[in-house]
Amino acid sequence: MLLRGIPAAEKILQRLKEEISQSPTSPGLAVVLIGNDPASEVYVGMKVKKATEIGIISKAHKLPSDSTLSSVLKLIERLNQDPSIHGILVQLPLPKHLDSEVILQAISPDKDVDGLHPVNMGKLLLGNFDGLLPCTPAGIIELLNYYEIPLRGRHAAIVGRSNIVGKPLAALMMQKHPQTNCTVTVLHSQSENLPEILKTADIIIAALGAPLFIKETMVAPHAVIVDVGTTRVPADNAKGYTLLGDVDFNNVVTKCAAITPVPGGVGPMTVAMLMSNTWRCYQNFS
């Protein structure tokens, strides 16, 4: 079975659009883009477009790649103080000379639509869902629930330990909550016996950023696989590149119970949860 993200995301977005249309004012989302990374520019454009479609007023703030930390922090502080802005997103990755941790921590936790501020991450770890959940982990759970993939008591293996996906997803999936409550194993590229461990997993989340890393010999026939990876690889086509996931899709798709495609799997869910968090921020302010 293919776990396509678009229908699941559209269901969420349609609900948000209906709720926002009944609001006396519109939520405001500020997206900060630093530099000229082509992929980041595409992603920001997609987010701004989707926000506009459902009634969120969204504006991209573009800064040059040589921007100083001070100038970025000044912009974020201005957005923190702006009552018309309910959510702030800083598009990652940042230019190497900028400290992403310092910048993300400068965002008000109440406007942290990415859910990456230490306050929101801390609430997640403590099992407090009053905070804003990181978009990709939350989107993965919503996607699995949409396709009625049972999670309670299942063994979930997460390959990757980033602050954006791996760590918060592990914290989310292990929570004693009706939608999660998994037994979680966190792995990475240097983990010993990785193939053997993956074969015991009911659910595999691939979030390494290593194209085609997960092979068909690593998965059990009953496994549900969520591929978070999106690596641009040069290709002889109109775009000049193709997107590859962390899973060797063509060989794995016939060896597992269900799998997300790349693109069209996790990506739409991440955007949907970003919009959901923005609406939630607006409601909290109102």
Swiss-Prot record:
Family annotation (SUPFAM superfamilies): Aminoacid dehydrogenase-like, N-terminal domain, NAD(P)-binding Rossmann-fold domains
Keyword field: Amino-acid biosynthesis, Histidine biosynthesis, Hydrolase, Methionine biosynthesis, Multifunctional enzyme, NADP, One-carbon metabolism, Oxidoreductase, Purine biosynthesis
Catalytic activity, reaction form: (6R)-5,10-methylene-5,6,7,8-tetrahydrofolate + NADP(+) = (6R)-5,10-methenyltetrahydrofolate + NADPH; (6R)-5,10-methenyltetrahydrofolate + H2O = (6R)-10-formyltetrahydrofolate + H(+)
Amino-acid positions noted as binding NADP(+) in the UniProt annotation, renumbered to this chain: 160-162, 189, 230
A GO cellular component annotation in the UniProt record: cytosol
UniProt key word Oxidoreductase: yes
Signal peptide: none
Entry GO MF terms: methenyltetrahydrofolate cyclohydrolase activity; methylenetetrahydrofolate dehydrogenase (NADP+) activity
Pathway: One-carbon metabolism; tetrahydrofolate interconversion
Entry-linked CDD domains: NAD_bind_m-THF_DH_Cyclohyd
Function: Catalyzes the oxidation of 5,10-methylenetetrahydrofolate to 5,10-methenyltetrahydrofolate and then the hydrolysis of 5,10-methenyltetrahydrofolate to 10-formyltetrahydrofolate.
Subunit composition and interactions: Homodimer.
Similarity comment: family membership: Belongs to the tetrahydrofolate dehydrogenase/cyclohydrolase family.
Protein's UniProt name: Bifunctional protein FolD
Organism: Chlamydia pneumoniae (Chlamydophila pneumoniae)
